[in-house]
Amino acid sequence: MKIGVLGIQGDVYEHYTAIRPLKNKYKVEAYIIRSPEEINEMDGIIIPGGESTTITRFLSRYINIINENVRNGMKIMGTCAGAIILSKDTGDPRVHGTGIMDIKIQRNAYGRQIDSFIDAVNIKNIGTFNAVFIRAPVIDDPGKTSVLGEYNGKPVIVENENAIAMTFHPELTGDLRVHEYFLRKVMGN
């Protein structure tokens, strides 16, 4: 199984290093995607957290290939800014979502960098997870997605058939269970 981390900007290396320890258990190889053509070789891709306006500027080269592959069954995971990119409605004209997930999301809803925090979130099929929220977005409307976890009554991790989006950063915790959940989704389990 090949998992690619979109190497535009943000926590690229952190996701890459989160996948690598799972190599033997899931027979997975991690790659950093530097060109749109590499997406076609992957079984799943991760859009990392970072700055959503920056990611949007460079995403245009990748968007058609990503959308086509996801329509054809490829699995995708977006964290923080990656969740914004997967959304249908970003609430910000500078940031264009792909519409892969039927969610309405609000950028930087928890405040500025100084307002970042870690708190426990109970995630369906995973359990209690210490989630890292950094200038995190809020999912205002989960649409037709399944809500896997909430924080203060708002969805923070949702999924549909081919995608998982979360407003926190699992790659910064050392806890690999969210990445394992994604790998099982890629495998069809």
Swiss-Prot record:
NCBIfam families: PLP_synth_Pdx2
Protein's gene: pdxT
Family of the protein in this entry: Belongs to the glutaminase PdxT/SNO family.
Alphabetical list of HAMAP family matching this protein: PdxT
PROSITE patterns: PDXT_SNO_1, PDXT_SNO_2
The entry's keywords: Glutamine amidotransferase, Hydrolase, Lyase, Pyridoxal phosphate
Active site, per annotation: C80, H169, E171
Biological process according to GO: glutamine catabolic process; pyridoxal phosphate biosynthetic process; pyridoxine metabolic process
InterPro entries from the UniProt entry: Class_I_gatase-like, PdxT/SNO, PdxT/SNO_CS
Subunit structure: In the presence of PdxS, forms a dodecamer of heterodimers. Only shows activity in the heterodimer.
Binding site for L-glutamine: G50, E51, S52, R107, I134, R135
SUPFAM superfamilies: Class I glutamine amidotransferase-like
Reactions that this protein is recorded to catalyse: aldehydo-D-ribose 5-phosphate + D-glyceraldehyde 3-phosphate + L-glutamine = pyridoxal 5'-phosphate + L-glutamate + phosphate + 3 H2O + H(+); L-glutamine + H2O = L-glutamate + NH4(+)
Gene3D superfamilies membership: 3.40.50.880
E.C. number: 4.3.3.6, 3.5.1.2
Pathway annotation from the record: Cofactor biosynthesis; pyridoxal 5'-phosphate biosynthesis
Function: Catalyzes the hydrolysis of glutamine to glutamate and ammonia as part of the biosynthesis of pyridoxal 5'-phosphate. The resulting ammonia molecule is channeled to the active site of PdxS.
Ranges in coiled-coil conformation: none
Gene Ontology CC entries for this record: cytosol; glutaminase complex
Protein name: Pyridoxal 5'-phosphate synthase subunit PdxT
Naturally occurring in which organism (per UniProt): Picrophilus torridus (strain ATCC 700027 / DSM 9790 / JCM 10055 / NBRC 100828 / KAW 2/3)
CDD domains for the chain: GATase1_PB (cd01749)
GO MF: glutaminase activity; pyridoxal 5'-phosphate synthase (glutamine hydrolysing) activity
